[in-house]
């Protein structure tokens, strides 16, 4: 019997989408003419692109080479000029670069459109949270919750032989899990520690399935827009899990009227953190939530279950050993980052292309897991959420400093639920 799932993912009045940041380091790719170019990956899961080391915007051409890009009709498209490192550019290339001098500004304008902006609503008037009160994510950040996880192979890329439901269940739930280098606990361990026990998740690995198309079908990008068929992957994976006997009704939460979140681990690397020449066709790890949505009645089964949000993350992560690029099971950092979005946290990193803006913003960087802290130790050791993020999620009380005296800050793991953090308000902002 075919099982049915109703998705409240697809006809939305308002949605929020968040993603892991692109890897922060430059890397080298071989061009169609045999030359090598050093680039940065930029953007996010909605709008991705590359830049040269001197900040010029690049886009993939039909031959998979990197070309200087221009914005036309709100789309980022490749010109006919193959890109090179600064020292290798010839006169015609330099002439075109001068002509494209506004491209970076145009890309930043595209990224400032409403669909790329993030709004974060606190549960009180000042944008902060209240201790013991959930944030406004797809998943409530207080209490016990069970989240279904599906492992997905593509038609042309299989999950590794060691990637079993038991293995991933251990990685996500086992106390003190440490199988891979730099691992110091499971995803559940992390959330119990960050919330000091206020949030107690169980990540139930419910199925291992194989979808009907190859990775490039679902991960296809179009004019800078990423992963245009990723929802097909989510629907198909859930249908296949239901056909295997997974009853999604058991994950419905009464106060939400749906399954709050389905998590998917897909085979191979992810677009955000891979340097493979075909990595544009990988899916960029991200989380998607429907907010104030209208349900369309679209059915793909007979369980009558709605799914409120999903996130997708990659199986493998890159690392370099002895100058050789290798891949191994991704650590929990990607999972933790995307699940942070499901709890209501936005990205903390700058997605634009202007180095001066990036330097001026001075985000938390490696000190925040919702920024590039998710790349610590090859994405195996998650950095703590910031005090603001824990306050927003209802896990930490902030004490406002109003008078001059001596204050002390203790390490996070010393004080337990009495952990102290301070807030200083700027009356002019």
Language model: regions and residue ranges:
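Bacterial Sec-dependent N-terminal signal peptides
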Residues: 1-21
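Extracellular hydrolytic enzyme modules, especially secreted metalloproteases
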Residues: 261-263, 267-429
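Zymogen propeptides/activation segments of proteases
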Residues: 18-299, 417-429
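Terminal low-complexity, poorly structured segments
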Residues: 1-8, 90-92, 96, 106, ...
């Amino acid at each position: 019997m075919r099982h049915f799932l109703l998705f409240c993912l697809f006809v939305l009045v308002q949605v929020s989408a968040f993603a892991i940041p692109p890897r922060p380091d430059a890397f080298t790719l071989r061009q169609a003419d045999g030359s090598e170019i050093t680039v940065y990956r930029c953007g996010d899961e909605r709008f991705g692109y590359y830049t040269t080391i001197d900040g010029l915007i690049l886009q993939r051409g039909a031959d998979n080479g990197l070309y200087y890009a221009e914005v036309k009709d709100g789309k980022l498209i490749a010109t006919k000029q193959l890109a090179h490192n600064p020292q290798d550019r010839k006169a015609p290339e330099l002439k075109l670069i001068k002509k494209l001098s506004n491209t970076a500004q145009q890309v930043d304008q595209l990224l400032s459109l409403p669909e790329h902006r993030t709004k974060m609503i606190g549960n009180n008037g000042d944008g902060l949270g209240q201790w013991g009160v959930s944030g406004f994510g797809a998943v409530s950040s207080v209490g016990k919750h069970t989240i279904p996880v599906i492992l997905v192979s593509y038609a042309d890329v299989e999950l590794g032989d060691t990637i079993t439901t038991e293995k991933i269940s251990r990685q996500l739930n086992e106390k003190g899990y440490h199988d891979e280098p730099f691992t110091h606990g499971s995803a559940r361990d992390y959330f119990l520690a960050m919330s000091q026990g206020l949030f107690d998740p169980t990540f139930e690995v419910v199925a291992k399935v194989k979808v009907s198309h190859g990775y490039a079908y679902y991960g296809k990008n179009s004019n800078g827009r990423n992963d245009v068929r990723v929802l097909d992957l989510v629907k198909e994976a859930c249908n296949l899990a239901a056909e295997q006997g997974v009853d999604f009704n058991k994950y419905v939460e009464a106060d939400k009227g749906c399954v709050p979140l389905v998590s998917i681990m897909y085979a191979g690397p992810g677009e955000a953190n891979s340097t493979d020449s075909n990595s544009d066709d990988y899916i960029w790890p991200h989380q998607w939530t429907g907010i104030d949505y209208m349900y369309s009645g679209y059915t793909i089964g007979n369980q009558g279950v709605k799914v409120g949000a999903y996130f997708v993350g990659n199986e493998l992560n890159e690392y370099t050993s002895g100058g050789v690029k290798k891949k191994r099971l991704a650590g929990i950092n990607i999972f933790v980052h995307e699940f942070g979005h499901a709890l209501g946290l936005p990205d903390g990193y700058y997605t634009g292309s202007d180095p001066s803006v990036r330097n001026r913003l001075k985000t938390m960087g490696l000190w925040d897991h919702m920024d590039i802290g998710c790349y610590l130790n090859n994405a195996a050791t998650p950095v703590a959420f910031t005090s603001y993020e824990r306050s927003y999620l209802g896990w930490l009380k902030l004490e406002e400093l109003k008078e001059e005296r001596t204050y002390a800050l203790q390490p996070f793991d010393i004080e337990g639920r009495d952990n102290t953090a301070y807030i200083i308000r700027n009356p002019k902002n």
